[in-house]
UniProtKB/Swiss-Prot annotation:
Extracellular topological intervals: 52-830
SUPFAM superfamilies xrefs: beta-lactamase/transpeptidase-like (SSF56601), Lysozyme-like (SSF53955)
The protein's name in its UniProt record: Penicillin-binding protein 1A
Biased composition (Basic and acidic residues): 747-758
Source organism per UniProt: Clostridium perfringens (strain ATCC 13124 / DSM 756 / JCM 1290 / NCIMB 6125 / NCTC 8237 / Type A)
Catalytic reactions of this protein: [GlcNAc-(1->4)-Mur2Ac(oyl-L-Ala-gamma-D-Glu-L-Lys-D-Ala-D-Ala)](n)-di-trans,octa-cis-undecaprenyl diphosphate + beta-D-GlcNAc-(1->4)-Mur2Ac(oyl-L-Ala-gamma-D-Glu-L-Lys-D-Ala-D-Ala)-di-trans,octa-cis-undecaprenyl diphosphate = [GlcNAc-(1->4)-Mur2Ac(oyl-L-Ala-gamma-D-Glu-L-Lys-D-Ala-D-Ala)](n+1)-di-trans,octa-cis-undecaprenyl diphosphate + di-trans,octa-cis-undecaprenyl diphosphate + H(+); Preferential cleavage: (Ac)2-L-Lys-D-Ala-|-D-Ala. Also transpeptidation of peptidyl-alanyl moieties that are N-acyl substituents of D-alanine
Name of the encoding gene: pbpA
Length: 830
């Protein structure tokens, strides 16, 4: 035992020796130095990180933050006040003196009790929240408290986003400290109360007072102030109008009592006020008088699309997020100068509202729904296509609630035959496939054409017959579907869609066939809408008066920020070349025929030239007219939101309305024409073959078949007409009764006709030269295939099995009605 004690003592002495103590001391010394260095390094790294975040913070624009108290304003094209910006986000700016003292104290008490003491951030609250959150984590609670002051919340609402990150929090704290250096406490609190989210679409205490109590904010009592003060922490949870809280109001009632308790604790209200308020809640609860009515602007149809366009342009130019641009538009003090002509806008609305304009529609056109809104609706757009500025845009007929669906701008529908100038004849002429005088056969599709177009069975014309050889001009005037399908097939679906998309039409995945490009039949799936609207069509038809150039349509001319700086400007229009100047002019000239002598005569007004095209969708469910003058382009739509048949024709209803509104737009304007470009010529053509005429084309028993029409230089036909042929027949001897079979040696001799020498100044069009020259509907026994001859011109068949002869001149067969009519898609459009 003694030996063991001695060994233990020796080890203890060795351990406590100065040498060993020195090692321990050194270890502890270096350990603490290491900890210190690690701490210094960590602090340095964190400091550098924080400093880098601060440096990346957005510049504090105090005026911009205060401008959240300024409503954005819209002006008309003369600079006169139109509307205050009202978005779906309801926000009504009020001054500090309009806000009750109890409401200010309620927010301060429950949100930031040391608001009047701190300099932007509450250090005491930060450490208190950290300790509370750590304690909660240790106890298994997932509840996390926040430490943001009112100043920080204002910075988040006005400058930053709702992103949850340390970076955003550091920026928020830094900017809050900076803001306190520039604004008084009352200025900060007032701006905060005008911008704080209050649930749903309500922002600011004034909007909330209207929603919950139908009161001006200045008229709120103590309990109502306490309720709104408690609402902002969790607007959905404490929403007294929600169904859940109506059944069990204890959540928002207890929250209101908590606000009152805090106000009393801080000395903002007396004990008597506190007790009276609590007794009122216990006895009567909180009496809500909800007001969910959305505010309506003075020029609802024009204002909201203009705001939409400005938002999109701001996001594109300045890379704003949706949240940022919504804040800026709602209350950023912007001045938006629109292109709206106030008088024209009002007058177009009156025309669309007038029940007398819909008398041709026989199935109760003035019927209203349960909200007092006409079931039969209409929309219209008028554009100065040179500048792209929209002068009038009306999205509905009759009085309608705020935020009603704008059919002129937001809606997309099938456009029927209004597509034909845009995606059929315009592209065909532009691509050099023909001119106004090129001929296409209005006849049933051949088997080859059925296959190439995708039709299983024969499509039909609206007029339910076939007209035989038609010029492009006549085909578009009478809106031949068969002719359009054949020409569109030559153009190619992909080419047609490319033109249509550049013109603003939208093609969904199921609307990429020839029935869409030739006839305007869009699928228009509710989940994937496509087609066009009057805004789109008015812009598109403007190209025919603007040398083939589409000027981007704009509803505003410029936007100024709250400091008066121009932040958006449309004085230099965005332009896209669609057609050549020559092709666009030829289409314009063709489109005048439907107004001058076709189904759209009522679209004509005064002495101003008018060109346009009707459109009808399947089953007479939509009627359209789109057109232009040398000054403006416009489009009209009439139909039901829930489509149903209208039992008349597009030209009967839409063209008179077009004439009326465009007459108003052209008041006091002088006659002028669209300027004819160089590079086009009027060329003599045979209206039966579409080829160069010979002298025989003038000898047709129906009258001369030669006429003159526009072609782009170099695209006119080069082949001579082979329809009209001069035959010499050896007639039998009528005195010989026995020679009925004896003249086998008699031969028909064909002589080559002379080329016709046309007068190149002749301006006759087919309908002007001989109104009786239109082919009849006599069935033909010949091949109805369409051939492409001479520079891509679509021409009718050339090899016939049966010829009608008269005076030795062979005339072409007429279109037949004897084809299979069991078509895959026999919907009729015009």
């Amino acid at each position: 035992m003694t030996e063991r004690k001695r060994e233990h003592k020796d080890r203890k002495q060795k351990k406590n020796s100065p040498k060993n103590q020195s090692k321990v001391t050194k270890f502890l010394k270096w350990f603490f130095i290491g900890i210190l260095l690690l701490g210094i390094t960590a602090v340095t790294v964190v400091g550098i990180y924080v400093l880098s975040i601060i440096r990346s913070s957005p510049e504090l624009d105090v005026q911009a933050i205060q401008s959240l108290n300024q409503p954005s304003i819209l002006y008309d094209d003369q600079g006169n006040f139109m509307d205050n910006v009202i978005t779906r986000e309801q926000r009504y700016v009020v001054k500090s003196e309009e806000i009750p003292d109890n409401l200010k104290k309620a927010f301060v008490a429950i949100e930031d009790e040391r608001f009047y003491e701190h300099k932007g951030i509450d250090i005491k609250r930060i450490f208190g929240v950290i300790a509370s959150n750590i304690k909660g984590k240790l106890s298994g609670s997932n509840t996390v408290q926040g430490a943001s002051t009112i100043t920080q919340q204002l910075i988040k609402n006005a400058v930053l986003t709702n992103e949850v990150s340390y970076e955003r929090k550091i920026k928020e704290m830094y900017l809050a400290l900076e803001l306190e250096k520039h604004l008084s406490k009352d200025e900060i609190l007032t701006t905060y109360l005008n911008t704080i989210p209050m649930g749903g679409y309500q922002y600011g205490v004034s909007a909330a007072a209207q929603r919950f109590f139908s009161k001006n904010v200045s008229d709120l009592n103590l309990v109502e102030c306490a309720y709104l003060g408690g609402l902002t922490q969790a607007p959905t949870s404490y929403d007294g109008l929600s169904e859940a809280n109506k059944e069990n109001p204890s959540r928002y009632l207890n929250r209101t009592k908590s606000v009152l308790f805090k106000m009393h604790e801080l000395g903002y209200i007396s004990s008597e006020q506190y007790n009276d308020a609590i007794n009122e809640i216990d006895t009567n609860g909180i009496k809500f008088t909800p007001n969910n009515k959305l505010s309506k602007t003075n020029f609802e149809w024009f204002t909201r699309p203009a705001i939409t366009q400005v938002k999109q342009d701001l996001m594109n130019k300045y890379k704003y997020t949706q949240e940022e641009v919504d804040k800026l538009i709602a209350n950023g003090g912007l001045k938006i100068y629109t292109s709206m002509d106030r008088n024209l806008q009002n007058n177009v609305q009156k025309v669309l509202d007038d029940p007398n304009n819909y008398k041709a529609i026989t199935n109760n056109p003035n019927e209203k729904n349960e909200d007092g809104v006409y079931k039969l609706q209409a929309s219209a757009t008028i554009i100065d296509y040179k500048t792209g500025h929209v002068k009038a845009l009306v999205g509905g007929r009759g009085e309608q609630p705020a935020m009603s669906h704008n059919r002129a701008y937001y809606d997309l529908k099938s456009i029927g035959s209004a597509t034909k100038p845009l995606t059929v004849y315009g592209p065909a002429i532009d691509l050099g496939l023909g001119g106004a005088g090129s001929v296409v056969n209005d006849s049933p599709l051949s088997n080859k054409e059925l296959s190439s177009t995708g039709y299983k069975d024969q499509p039909k014309n609206e007029y339910n017959s076939y007209r035989g050889p038609l010029t492009f001009r006549e085909a578009i005037k009478i809106s031949s579907n068969l002719a359009a399908i054949k020409v569109a097939n030559e153009v190619g679906v992909s080419n047609s869609i490319a033109y249509g998309e550049k013109l603003g039409l939208v093609y969904g995945p199921h609307s990429r066939g020839i029935s869409t490009t030739a006839l305007g039949q869009f699928q228009n799936d509710p989940n994937n809408p496509d087609g066009g609207n009057t805004y789109t069509l008015a812009s598109a038809f403007g190209v025919f008066g603007n040398n083939g150039v589409k000027t981007n349509a704009k509803l505003y001319t410029k936007v100024l920020d709250s400091h008066g700086n121009v932040i958006l400007d449309t004085s230099t229009p965005e332009e896209t070349k669609i057609f050549s100047p020559q092709a666009s002019y030829i289409v314009y000239d063709m489109l005048k025929d439907q107004v001058e002598s076709g189904s759209a005569k009522p679209a004509k007004f005064g002495n101003i030239p008018v060109a346009g095209k009707t459109g009808t969708t399947t089953g007479d469910k939509d009627y359209l007219f789109a057109g232009l003058t040398p000054y403006y382009s416009a489009a009209i739509w009439i139909g039901y939101d829930k489509p149903r048949e209208m039992r008349t024709s597009s030209g009967t209803v839409t063209s008179p309305i077009f004439g009326k509104i465009m007459g108003l737009a052209h008041k006091d304007l002088q006659y002028k024409e669209v300027e004819q470009p160089s590079g086009i010529s009027k060329i003599a053509v045979c209206m039966d073959s579409g080829l160069k005429p010979t002298s025989l084309c003038t000898q047709d028993p129906r009258g001369s078949r030669v006429y003159y029409d526009w072609f782009i230089n170099g695209s006119a036909p080069t082949q001579y007409c082979n329809y009209h042929t001069n035959l010499h027949v050896n007639a039998p001897d009528t005195n010989d009764n026995n020679n009925s079979g004896a003249n086998e040696g008699n031969k028909q001799q064909e002589t080559k006709p002379e080329e016709v020498k046309p007068n190149e100044n002749n301006n006759n069009k087919p309908n002007e030269q001989n109104p009786n020259n239109k082919p009849d509907n006599t069935p033909a026994n010949g091949n109805n295939n369409t051939n492409n001859n001479g520079g891509g011109n679509v021409t009718p068949p050339q090899n016939q099995t049966e010829n009608n002869t008269n005076n030795g001149v062979i005339t072409p067969p007429q279109a037949g009605n004897n084809q299979n009519q069991n078509g895959q898609n026999n919907n009729i459009t015009q």
